[in-house]
Amino acid sequence: MGQVEKGKKIFVQRCAQCHTVEKAGKHKTGPNLNGILGRKTGQAAGFSYTDANRNKGITWKNETLFEYLENPKKYIPGTKMVFAGLKKQKERQDLIAYLEAATK
């Protein structure tokens, strides 16, 4: 299980330039992540996704985010997300803990 505060720091350093988490937050280069857990890939209303994201057909949950965040381009070939990923398991756990808390 990850630590929310450590995950928040990772989000601010590595994710916040492209993503927001607030309810009704705006899309940036990447989609707003509010409500991501339980949502299918490529489904944030008002965001222009690649076909690869729309067609992946998985539902975001802890396990799928954990795998995706290690190497986004490997998990969804054709995604426009330029983030290289988080190789450290603990960092991914912390980030997911933060996303769980911040995007309900």
From Swiss-Prot:
Residues noted as binding heme c in the record, renumbered to the chain: C15, C18, H19, M81
Post-translational modification: Binds 1 c group covalently group per subunit.
Family: Belongs to the cytochrome c family.
GO cellular component, one term: mitochondrial intermembrane space
GO molecular function list: electron transfer activity; heme binding; metal ion binding
Alphabetized UniProt keyword annotations: Electron transport, Heme, Iron, Metal-binding, Mitochondrion, Respiratory chain, Transport
Entry function: Electron carrier protein. The oxidized form of the cytochrome c heme group can accept an electron from the heme group of the cytochrome c1 subunit of cytochrome reductase. Cytochrome c then transfers this electron to the cytochrome oxidase complex, the final protein carrier in the mitochondrial electron-transport chain.
Domain of life: Eukaryota
Subcellular location: Mitochondrion intermembrane space
Protein name: Cytochrome c
InterPro entries: Cyt_c-like_dom, Cyt_c-like_dom_sf, Cyt_c_1A/1B
A Pfam family hit: Cytochrom_C
Main location: mitochondrion
Source organism per UniProt: Asterias rubens (Common European starfish)
Metal-binding among keywords: yes
